[in-house]
Structures are given as C-alpha cells and as structure tokens.
C-alpha cells in the first residue's frame, strides 16, 4: 500500500512552496482514516497532523519533507515523473510514504502520547523548516521531541546509520555577480573582461579551504555553475558564479564567508569591476541530541533486526537542523541501496526500505510513546 503511495507521489514532484498536488494527495489520504483522534492544519503547502494519544504526557514529532528537484528524470520505471523537468531525486516521496505509514499505524493502534506529523515543504529551497517552525500553527503544537530520516543510496536495505552530535553540515548557497565592461574581442584593452575575472576568482576561492581553514576542521566551497558571455567574439561584460559552502561548525562558516568577501574585494580592484555577493538560503547544522540518539540506537540494537551503523558526519545540508536547534531529537540515514546517488537523474531507491522504515519507526514510537506506562508498572 505505502509503496503505491510512494509511486503516486513520485509521479507528481513539485518545487518548494509549489507542492499543491502533493499537499492535496496527502489530505485526500488523511480523509480516509478514522478522524476521532486526528487534528489537521495546513500551513502554506505543508501539513501538520496531530494524532491524540490515550493519556499524553508529551508530544513526539515526526518530520517528512515534500518537495522535488528541478531535474529531468532518466529512470525507466513505469511510475516516472509526469512533471517535465521535475523529479523526486532526493527521496522525499519515500519520506512522505513512510510518514503516512507510521501515522496510519498510530491512528489504528493508539499510543499513550500525542504525535505530531510534520509534512514540510521546500527543504531543497528556499527552506521551509524555519518559517514553518516559527508559524503560529506549529507554535500551538510544538512537540517535545522530534525525529526524521533521510534515504541513503550507499547503505543496503535493512541498515540505518546515525550518530550522536553533529550529523550534517552547516550549508549556504553562494551567488557572486561580476560586472565589468563588454566590447569587441579585437579591442580587449577597451574592456573589462569578466570571464577572466571569474576564472581568477574561482581559482582564488579554492585557496580558502587549503590555506585559511584549520586542517582539523572541514569545509567545502563548490562553484557548480558559471554563466558569462554571449558569443565567441564579444568580451563578456558580466559573469555569475553559483555554488555552495559547507562547514562542520558555524565558526568555520563565518571564517569562510569573511575570506570570500575579502577575495571578492580584491577582484574588484584587480579587474576594475563591480561585484555583488548573495548567500541565498542557509541551513543550520543537523545536531542530534546525544541522550535521545543514544537511546534510539540502543533500541534498534536490542529490539529490532535492523543493522545499525555508527556513521561519521557528512557535508550534506538539511534544514531539519533548524528544528533540532529548538527541539531535542535526531535524524538518521535509511539504507535504500541504489547505484545512483541523491540528486541524480537515475536515482532508483529500493522500495523494500519503505516497509523496513515503517516497521522500525512504529515499534520505536510505540515503545517511546508508551514508555511512561512501562515505568509506572515496574
């Protein structure tokens, strides 16, 4: 059933804050469930679903992101995307299907505590977690703890991976516009060539990690797109660099940004041009609560047959970090065993992982949500 839900959602990927079909699909499914314990709110294109417990002392939050990516799908599956230039290439279709599976179980098999299911838009950009967290709708239903997962193509089905503390990096988009003076290729001395300026800037940016960041820290600066020029015999008046910054600490992020700004000022002087920097969307690090994460890992090892890997931190960016900065909780990787990675046009995760995740999470939230009962019975 939830594999079919995943396939339905896979066919209708939508970009951030445009998830209208996705939102309606989830609302239509929720309407088929018994409503006695359900409360539903919408926030922009997101959804909050509160499942009331039998004798709540806390609220357990579970977050699933909803948006797709601007990628042309290149798989040959019969349920491939029907939206041209859009694809669920980061597994958010699976995230939603798993959340609905857990939600359905809790509705039919109530636990003591309340649960809040958060279907969050715009994880890929411009970022939905922070504004959703600050919304009146969520403030009224703020959970006491929160958890989430992310699919991991590199891990086999039946495996999850996580760790206490830092799991994902601080990330920031990076956009730099250079403005010079165009002209005929035969008269370069009368121009200010922004292709040359951009080339120099890209090379200088690479020295930040190697010469300005402590080798014991971690940072990555990637320029993934360079746009400049019109035709081969015209010197480019403008250039635009687009990329990302990733660091394992907020302090390193500030240092990297400071060096970028200093280098860009030097480019302005050296190439007699103007430059503008925009950092775009910025995501805070995913930092797992040590007590809750350790408790979860012990539960997985003792109470399930799921294989647990204690992984290292990754340079991945996730706006779930904003939620973890305010609500204790954790995130983990779910193995889906795909030869193609996240954000790849041929990503094809193994759907058997959906049932693995639903069974694991329903057992965990049932244990966690009834934990007070067990303590009182001792």
Curated annotation (Swiss-Prot):
It catalyses: N-acetyl-(2S,6S)-2,6-diaminopimelate + H2O = (2S,6S)-2,6-diaminopimelate + acetate. It is an enzyme of class 3 (hydrolase). GO terms for molecular function: N-acetyldiaminopimelate deacetylase activity. Keywords: Amino-acid biosynthesis, Diaminopimelate biosynthesis, Hydrolase, Lysine biosynthesis. Its EC number is 3.5.1.47. The active site is at 65, 124 (proton acceptor). Pfam families: M20_dimer, Peptidase_M20. Pathway: Amino-acid biosynthesis; L-lysine biosynthesis via DAP pathway; LL-2,6-diaminopimelate from (S)-tetrahydrodipicolinate (acetylase route): step 3/3. GO terms for biological process: diaminopimelate biosynthetic process; lysine biosynthetic process via diaminopimelate. It comes from the Bacteria. SUPFAM superfamilies: Bacterial exopeptidase dimerisation domain (SSF55031), Zn-dependent exopeptidases (SSF53187). The keyword DNA-binding does not apply. InterPro entries: AcetylDAP_deacetylase, Amidohydrolase, Bact_exopeptidase_dim_dom, Peptidase_M20, Peptidase_M20_dimer. Belongs to the peptidase M20A family. N-acetyldiaminopimelate deacetylase subfamily. Catalyzes the conversion of N-acetyl-diaminopimelate to diaminopimelate and acetate. NCBIfam families: amidohydrolases. This is N-acetyldiaminopimelate deacetylase.
């Amino acid at each position: 059933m939830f594999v079919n839900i995943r396939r339905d959602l896979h066919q209708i990927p939508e970009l951030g804050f445009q998830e209208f079909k996705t939102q309606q699909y989830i609302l239509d499914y929720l309407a088929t469930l018994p409503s006695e314990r359900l409360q539903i709110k919408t926030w922009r294109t997101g959804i909050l679903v509160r499942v009331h417990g039998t004798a709540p002392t806390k609220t357990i939050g579970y977050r699933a992101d909803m948006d797709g990516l601007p990628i042309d799908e290149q798989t040959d599956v019969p349920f491939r995307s029907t939206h041209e230039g859009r694809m669920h290439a980061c597994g958010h279709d699976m995230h939603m299907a798993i959340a609905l599976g857990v939600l359905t179980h809790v509705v039919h098999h109530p636990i003591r505590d309340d649960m809040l299911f958060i279907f969050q838009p715009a994880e890929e950009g411009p970022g939905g977690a922070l504004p959703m967290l600050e919304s009146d709708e969520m403030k009224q239903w703020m959970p006491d703890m929160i958890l989430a997962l992310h699919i991991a193509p590199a891990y086999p089905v039946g495996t999850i991976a996580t760790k206490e503390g830092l799991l994902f990096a601080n990330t920031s988009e990076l956009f730099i516009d250079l403005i010079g003076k165009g002209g005929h290729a035969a008269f370069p001395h009368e121009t200010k060539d922004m292709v040359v300026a951009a080339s120099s800037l890209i090379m200088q940016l690479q020295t930040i990690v190697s010469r300005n960041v402590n080798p014991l820290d971690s940072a990555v600066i990637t320029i993934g797109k360079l746009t400049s020029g019109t035709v081969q015999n015209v010197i480019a008046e403008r250039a635009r660099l687009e990329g990302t910054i990733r660091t394992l600490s907020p302090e390193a992020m500030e240092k990297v940004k400071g060096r970028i700004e200093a280098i860009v000022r030097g480019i302005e002087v050296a190439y007699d041009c103007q430059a503008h920097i925009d950092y775009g969307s910025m995501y805070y690090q995913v930092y797992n609560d040590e007590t809750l994460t350790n408790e979860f890992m012990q539960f997985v090892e003792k109470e399930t047959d799921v294989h647990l890997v204690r992984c290292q931190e990754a340079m991945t960016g996730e706006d779930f970090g904003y939620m973890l900065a305010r609500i204790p909780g954790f995130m983990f990787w779910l193995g889906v065993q795909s030869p193609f990675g996240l954000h790849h046009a041929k990503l094809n995760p193994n759907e058997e992982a959906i049932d693995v995740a639903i069974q694991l999470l329903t057992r965990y939230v049932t244990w966690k949500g009834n934990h007070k009962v067990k303590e009182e019975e001792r």
